[in-house]
Every structure is written in C-alpha cells, then in structure tokens.
Amino acid sequence: MAKKSMIEREKKRQRLVEKYREKRQQLKAAMADPNIDQATRMELHAQLQKLPRASSPTRLRNRCWKTGRPRGYFRDFGLCRNSLREMAHRGLLPGVVKSSW
C-alpha cells in the first residue's frame, strides 16, 4: 500500500492538470502558429512557464485506485497487477475469466 501522502499528491496533480488543461492547450496552439513573430512566441513561452509545474500532464503517474501502487498498472481497470489478480479470482471484475487453451 502506498503512503497516503503519495496518493494525495497524485490526486492534487490530477486536479491541477484538469484546472490548467484548457489554458495550456491554448498557449501551445498559439505557439505552434507559424505566422507569429519571435517576440510574441517568447512571450507565450513565458506565460506557459508561469503555469504550475505540477499542472503538466507529463508529471502524472498512473496509480492503482485500490492500493495506490504505481507499478504494474492496467489502464483498462485502473488496478495494479496484484489487485487485478485478486479481484479476478474473486469474480469481482465482469467479463474477466481465467485463460484456458
């Protein structure tokens, strides 16, 4: 089980990413415009740099919603491999069956 502080830190990052998503996209789109001059591009870059560091989607880490484990994460379920296996054996994941061939 991950520390509570790590789980809460990740939740805070997710909130920040959502809060600044629109503004970040607008700034990046404006910077990508080939018709703007260099001074304007530098000003846009400065505005982008003023956004909180944690608001960048790159800083997000996928974590298991049950245990907070950051590794062995399955996107389809939002679970780590340990929790996925445990819940699948108990039949708590609809449509998941043991493999047999």
UniProtKB/Swiss-Prot annotation:
Look up keyword RNA-binding and say if it applies.
yes
GO molecular function, a single term: rRNA binding
Q: Which GO terms describe its biological process?
A: translation
Q: Does the record carry Lyase as a key word?
A: no
Per the record, the domain of life is Bacteria
Offer a single GO CC term for the protein: small ribosomal subunit
Q: Which Gene3D superfamilies match?
A: 1.10.287.1480
Instruction: List the cysteine pairs that form cystine.
Output: none
Q: Which UniProt keywords apply?
A: Ribonucleoprotein, Ribosomal protein, RNA-binding, rRNA-binding
Q: Which family does it belong to?
A: Belongs to the universal ribosomal protein uS14 family.
**Known role:** Binds 16S rRNA, required for the assembly of 30S particles and may also be responsible for determining the conformation of the 16S rRNA at the A site.
Provide the assembly information: Part of the 30S ribosomal subunit. Contacts proteins S3 and S10.
The protein's name is Small ribosomal subunit protein uS14
Organism field: Synechococcus sp. (strain JA-2-3B'a(2-13)) (Cyanobacteria bacterium Yellowstone B-Prime)
